[in-house]
Design a protein with these regions (language model features):
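Conserved GNAT acetyl-CoA-binding A-motif
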Residues: 118-120, 145-157
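Conserved acyl-donor/pantetheine-binding loop and adjacent beta-alpha core of acyl/acetyltransferases
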Residues: 66-128, 144, 179
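Conserved acetyl-CoA-binding loop-helix of GNAT-fold acetyltransferases
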Residues: 128-143
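Conserved N-terminal entry element of GNAT/NAT acetyltransferase domains
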Residues: 1-12
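Conserved catalytic-core motifs of GNAT/GCN5-like acyltransferases
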Residues: 171-187
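Conserved beta-strand-loop-alpha-helix junction that forms the acyl-donor binding cleft
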Residues: 123-129, 153-163
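Active-site rim helix/loop that mediates acceptor-substrate recognition in acyltransferases
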Residues: 34-57
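Short hydrophobic/aromatic beta-strand element in the GNAT-like acyltransferase core
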Residues: 55-60, 67, 120, 185-187
Length: 192
């Protein structure tokens, strides 16, 4: 697991994620228009990857095909600002990103007591192609949670990894349809 990444690694990761996230429910929520999703994913990762890497919130697989982020919900921001923000603002999808983020923050504040340190685990990649890499990154995040004493909170709009996460010791704390969408949201915790 790498906490930092050079420009070449970020570029390779972004290229792979732009492809994988086309059919990911999170990006389908963020950008419902399939024809625009690739462009949106490119803008999203251009904006976020470098920021996550600088804050040591981004962890990349050796193949650069999958990544996870560990973000404290207290660090969530509800605006895009700074480098590479304008294209994302103009994409027309900011509202969806922020609605999802606020919903996650609200659910986590109910599932995990306020006084507990926590990190939101988000997985970027294709479980069908890179399952072992994803599980490897998750296991390293689990160890980090144990070592540093925080609750690891996995939030997903896909059921693809829920069973695997349960087998590793995650527990479902919340599972419901996401607002009035076609997506089913699951929030799981580890090291609670």
């Amino acid at each position: 697991m790498k906490g930092t990444a050079d420009k070449q690694a970020l570029d390779a990761l972004q290229k792979n994620l732009n492809i994988y996230m086309q059919t990911d429910p999170l990006f389908m929520l963020f950008c419902p228009q399939k024809a625009k999703r690739s462009d949106f994913a490119d803008k999203y990762f251009t904006y976020y990857l470098e920021k996550w890497a600088e804050k040591k919130q981004l962890f990349i697989s050796e193949s650069r095909k999958t990544a996870v982020t560990l973000i404290d919900p207290a660090d969530y921001r509800y605006k895009f600002s700074g480098k590479n923000s304008l294209p994302l603002k103009l994409s027309g999808n900011s509202y969806s990103v922020f609605v999802h983020r606020k919903a996650v923050e609200s659910i986590v504040s109910i599932v995990v007591p306020v006084q507990k340190n926590k990190r939101i685990l988000t997985i970027y990649g294709n479980p069908a192609e890179n399952f072992d890499e994803i599980i490897g990154l998750v296991k390293q995040c689990m160890k980090k949670a144990e070592d540093e004493g925080f609750v690891l909170v996995y939030e997903t709009l896909s059921k693809k990894l829920v069973t695997a996460m349960e087998q590793m010791g995650f527990e479902i704390g919340y599972a419901k349809q996401f607002m009035n969408t076609q997506f089913f949201q699951t929030v799981m915790t580890y090291n609670f």
